Curated annotation (Swiss-Prot):
PANTHER family: DNAA INITIATOR-ASSOCIATING PROTEIN DIAA (PTHR30390:SF6), SEDOHEPTULOSE 7-PHOSPHATE ISOMERASE / DNAA INITIATOR-ASSOCIATING FACTOR FOR REPLICATION INITIATION (PTHR30390). One of its GO terms (cellular component) is DnaA-DiaA complex. It is found in: Cytoplasm. CDD domains: SIS_GmhA (cd05006). Belongs to the SIS family. GmhA subfamily. Binds 1 zinc ion per subunit. GO terms for biological process: carbohydrate metabolic process; D-glycero-D-manno-heptose 7-phosphate biosynthetic process; positive regulation of DNA-templated DNA replication initiation. The gene is gmhA. Pathway: Carbohydrate biosynthesis; D-glycero-D-manno-heptose 7-phosphate biosynthesis; D-glycero-alpha-D-manno-heptose 7-phosphate and D-glycero-beta-D-manno-heptose 7-phosphate from sedoheptulose 7-phosphate: step 1/1. This is Phosphoheptose isomerase. Residues 36-195 form the SIS domain. Keywords: Carbohydrate metabolism, Cytoplasm, Isomerase, Metal-binding, Zinc. The reaction produces a racemic mixture of D-glycero-alpha-D-manno-heptose 7-phosphate and D-glycero-beta-D-manno-heptose 7-phosphate.
Length: 201
């Protein structure tokens, strides 16, 4: 295959997957954005996590909430649980790698918080264990995964399953979803005067 054809095939497939995903999930995206905004407005926070490329997506999305996305506004509390090397290696060394997110959810998760687990395969044991802990503690849980992620999908309150088995296409859709959710949450919280008053300035 010529280089130009390979480039064209990659971006066309990326566009196709995203178009199908967002067409099928537009109502769910709106619902989840409202749930996240409600949690943040009532003093909750976001705990988000994943492995590898999904870890960088988690860090990226958390940064957009804590800093800003498109609006000048107060920071919103979001913690990527895959960023603290001391915590991660201590848990993995003393217990098991499958516990690295679950123990953090136990330590940091509080009533009203939102947990977002990102796994392209939907079978990452450490992500699934953390979701199980979140459910036991009464936290709302959201998954970013793919159509093959039945294990994770079955555990969460809200699941976003990308209609692809190609990891790059799945991850490209996940970060776009994260951006859209952040933009919607900003719009909800900072365009509604009543919500603005409740947030800590």
């Amino acid at each position: 295959m010529e280089i130009e054809d390979k480039i064209r095939k990659a971006y066309e497939e990326s566009v196709r997957v995203k178009e199908q995903f967002f067409r099928e999930n537009i109502s769910l995206i709106k619902e989840v954005a409202e749930i996240i905004a409600k949690s943040l407005n009532e003093g909750g926070k976001i705990l988000i996590f994943g492995n590898g490329g999904s870890a960088t997506d988690a860090s990226h999305i958390a940064a957009e909430f804590v800093n800003r996305f498109k609006r000048e506004r107060p920071g919103l509390p979001a913690i990527a649980l895959n960023t603290d090397m001391a915590v991660l290696t201590a848990i993995a060394n003393d217990y098991d790698y499958s516990e690295i997110f679950a123990k953090q959810v136990k330590a940091l998760g509080e009533s009203g918080d939102i947990v977002i687990g990102i796994s392209t395969s939907g079978s990452s044991r450490n992500v699934i264990k953390a979701i199980e802990v979140a459910k036991k503690r009464g936290l709302k849980s959201i998954a970013f995964t793919s159509k093959k992620g039945e294990k994770l999908i079955s555990k969460v309150d809200y699941a976003f399953a990308v209609p692809s088995e190609d990891t790059p296409r799945i991850q490209e859709t996940h970060i776009t979803l994260g951006h859209i959710l952040c933009e919607l949450v900003e719009d909800i919280l900072f365009e509604i005067p009543a919500a603005k008053k409740k947030l800590k300035q």
